[in-house]
Amino acid sequence: MESLLAAGAGGIGVAAAAAVVAATLAVVPPKDRGNNPPPAVPGLPVIGNMHQLKEKKPHHTFTKWSKTYGPIYTIKTGASSVVVLNSTEVAKEAMIEKFSSISTKKLPKALSVISRKNMVSISDYGDFYKMAKRNIMLAILGFNAQKHFCDTRERMVSNVLSSLHKLVAVDPHSPLNFREVYTTELFGLSLIQNLGEDVCSVYVEEFGREISKEEIFHVLVHEILSCVVEPDWRDYFPYLSWLPNKSFETIVSSTEFRRDAVMNALIKRQKERIARGEARISYIDFLLEAKNSTQLTDHQLMLLLAESIAAAVDTVLVTTEWAMYELAKNPDKQEWLYREIREVCGGKAVTEEDLPRLPYLDAVLHETLRLHSPVPVLPTRFVHDDTTLAGYDVPAGTQVMINVFGCHMDEEAWESPGEWSPERFLGEGFKLADRYKTLAFGAGRRTCAGSQQAVSIACVAIARFVQELQWTLREGDGDKEDTMQYTALKLHPLHVHLKPRGS
């Protein structure tokens, strides 16, 4: 599974943000820019600022521009105007106060086809979104569902630790690949929550063969991520949309076909297990009930299930891997966390019930989400009514893009923002409101539905990993902080030396 992640990883939620540059769909330019438009970044005729974003890490470029043009400015991508927001204050104004004017998402062609706008993270706010979110909250992400799956989540962490201990016992002196072990178990947890079992293999009729769990992951996660960032130049120049783009269309249709084939095979398998009374209650049961009451079509059911399977992996993987990297890089902070765990839990394994009594663990999580936000840039939204942001006129027809990375690097909001310092969330200078200055899970009505589960899994995992093992970076890895293109996934998987505590 490591080979898959080396090329790309993450669920539809991260995939949507990974497509953020492509998501600046060209629309009819605003007729009237108003009397007080945001500052504009100089660009070239026709293409605007597209040539300045070719490094595929737009969040870094946006943040650099904010030093010159301020927390809000306008760029051009082809025929479209995009207002980029780089401060938490202005971002929350857009997401909460002005939500009614800029709630519609604009998607690139690839993401639009792959999602058909029938996914929770992609659909616009309306009846379908509310129905779909209600079902996933009841099945997986709500309070009662979280209690139901608590033992499953904690068993997943125990399985990761068991695998790590075995690898250390076999070769105690060589660094091991943390991501490979962790992702396998995370994907297994996702399959249990969504389908009722950790699927080892499934027969896919369209392929004419049985495929392994690793290939299921490849089709449902890696291929989808690779597809949605596939550029289609017609997104930027809508007046040329009548021209064919055969290579793009072939990639998208092939990816959609393979995804649908695997998902339909998994759904068929689970329907058979449900009929035999073998399956535990999971997300698919709630979706089937919604389908039977005519709220969902078969295709919508399949898309919602595919989204949830992939989404359960991305945020937790990114956050946990970065947290363990920072703790291994900063042994003094690792020991601080270890001492806190010993004082609170003694020799007992950390559980979700212990989390409220572990303030430094909470600080480690929030600081990791701030510095390494799983979604560096939120998907573009469309302004459908004239509005204002930070006192500037933003006319209908404009698009709004929130640079989460830039918000978290804002020197007016954070002291030494480039440093990983959990202590900023502790002590006399810390205010509870500081936690909400991070935008890792969005804000307002579209706050990420899976935030509580992501926090619970990541916190228990981080605590248990530090509680049982001493973490040291592989030699030479102390400066490997680069990310994979549009995402926050570490470009280089975390390789660490582990030493069991007390040995």
UniProtKB/Swiss-Prot annotation:
Induction: By UV irradiation. Coiled coil: none annotated. PROSITE patterns: CYTOCHROME_P450. Its cofactor is heme. GO terms for biological process: ent-kaurene oxidation to kaurenoic acid; gibberellin biosynthetic process. The keyword Heme applies. The keyword Nucleotidyltransferase does not apply. Signal peptide: none annotated. GO terms for cellular component: chloroplast outer membrane. It is a single-pass membrane protein. The chain crosses the membrane at residues 8-28. It holds the Pfam family p450. Expressed in roots. Belongs to the cytochrome P450 family. This is Ent-kaurene oxidase-like 5. The lineage of its organism: Eukaryota, Viridiplantae, Streptophyta, Embryophyta, Tracheophyta.
